[in-house]
């Protein structure tokens, strides 16, 4: 794959991983399922280090799948309603692509809030454990865009250019064959943020009095959103509200919220809980 990227042969083999009779396993679904499984195992490992029963994540992952995937789809459909108004059954064809991470974050956050209260867990400590798995899952899931030949950027002739089949090109750009692989940019960016969050997590384990509860969540919001603001500007298929790219507006808002959170934790409210408080579950 690396050789293909840098020798101009970078293109999707198609959306279907394999097919047996009438059953087709699509790469998009396989990658989402893989991200969920890998994320679950990572959460159990990190959660145990923070004093959370790993078995709780077996329940939480069901809550998240039930909440995040439908909300990601509905968020996308809401801003693309003209495409679905006359073919509303296509709303359920999620295997064809068309989900929005910000929608998933909204649904997932609500699910985590309800779950944490139901199980008497610290909401912010739970988020600090979950966010490294979330960003890793995003890095994996972005490759679904590659196999679907979607979510690419403007035409380019860079060595790592991505070939897009004629049928998937925008109508006004059919004469161009190669485009920015924005999915790849975001996947690599997310892996970098994942490395930062993991490093911060283990720094917190070694120096618990120096890490405030909620820090990792705030760093995630800032790190991921900064990359999304940049990458979204390259894409040709952004969800729009008038002249505004929705993902950029939301991402800028999340950067501001994450920055405000860091300021609040470390400058305005220095007596807030840090990681030295090990009682994460109320008995």
UniProtKB/Swiss-Prot annotation:
Pfam families: LGT. One of its GO terms (molecular function) is phosphatidylglycerol-prolipoprotein diacylglyceryl transferase activity. Keywords: Cell inner membrane, Cell membrane, Membrane, Transferase, Transmembrane, Transmembrane helix. GO terms for cellular component: plasma membrane. A 1,2-diacyl-sn-glycero-3-phospho-(1'-sn-glycerol) binds at residue 142. It is found in: Cell inner membrane. Its EC number is 2.5.1.145. It is a multi-pass membrane protein. Pathway: Protein modification; lipoprotein biosynthesis (diacylglyceryl transfer). InterPro entries: Lgt (IPR001640). The chain crosses the membrane at residues 20-40, 60-80, 94-114, 121-141, 183-203, 214-234, 248-268. Its main location: membrane. The keyword Membrane applies. It is an enzyme of class 2 (transferase). Signal peptide: none annotated. One of its GO terms (biological process) is lipoprotein biosynthetic process. Belongs to the Lgt family. Catalyzes the transfer of the diacylglyceryl group from phosphatidylglycerol to the sulfhydryl group of the N-terminal cysteine of a prolipoprotein, the first step in the formation of mature lipoproteins. This is Phosphatidylglycerol--prolipoprotein diacylglyceryl transferase. It comes from Synechocystis sp. (strain ATCC 27184 / PCC 6803 / Kazusa). The lineage of its organism: Bacteria, Bacillati, Cyanobacteriota, Cyanophyceae, Synechococcales.
């Amino acid at each position: 794959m690396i050789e293909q990227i840098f020798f101009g042969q970078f293109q999707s083999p198609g959306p279907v991983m394999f097919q047996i009779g009438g059953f087709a396993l699509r790469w998009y679904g396989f990658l989402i399922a893989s991200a969920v499984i890998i994320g679950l195992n990572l959460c159990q490992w990190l959660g145990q280090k923070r004093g959370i029963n790993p078995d709780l994540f077996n329940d939480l992952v069901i809550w998240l799948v039930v909440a995040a995937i439908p909300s990601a789809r509905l968020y996308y459909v809401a801003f693309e309603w003209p495409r679905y108004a006359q073919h509303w059954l296509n709303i359920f064809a999620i295997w064809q692509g068309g989900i929005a991470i910000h929608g998933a974050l909204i649904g997932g956050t609500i699910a985590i809030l309800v779950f944490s209260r139901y199980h008497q867990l610290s909401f912010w400590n739970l988020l600090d454990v979950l966010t490294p798995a979330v960003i890793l899952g995003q890095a994996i899931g972005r490759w679904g865009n590659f196999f679907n030949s979607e979510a690419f950027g403007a035409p380019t002739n860079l060595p790592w250019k991505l070939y897009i089949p004629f049928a998937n090109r925008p109508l006004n750009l059919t004469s161009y064959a190669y485009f920015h692989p924005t999915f790849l940019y975001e996947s690599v960016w997310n892996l970098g943020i994942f490395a930062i969050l993991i490093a911060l997590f283990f720094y917190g384990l070694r120096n618990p009095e120096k890490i405030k509860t909620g820090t990792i969540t705030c760093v995630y919001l800032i790190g991921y959103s900064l990359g999304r603001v940049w990458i979204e500007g390259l894409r040709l298929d952004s969800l729009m509200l008038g002249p505004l790219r929705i993902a950029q507006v939301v991402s800028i808002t999340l950067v501001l919220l994450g920055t405000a959170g860091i300021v609040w934790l470390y400058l305005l409210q220095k007596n807030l809980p840090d990681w030295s408080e090990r009682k994460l579950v109320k008995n």
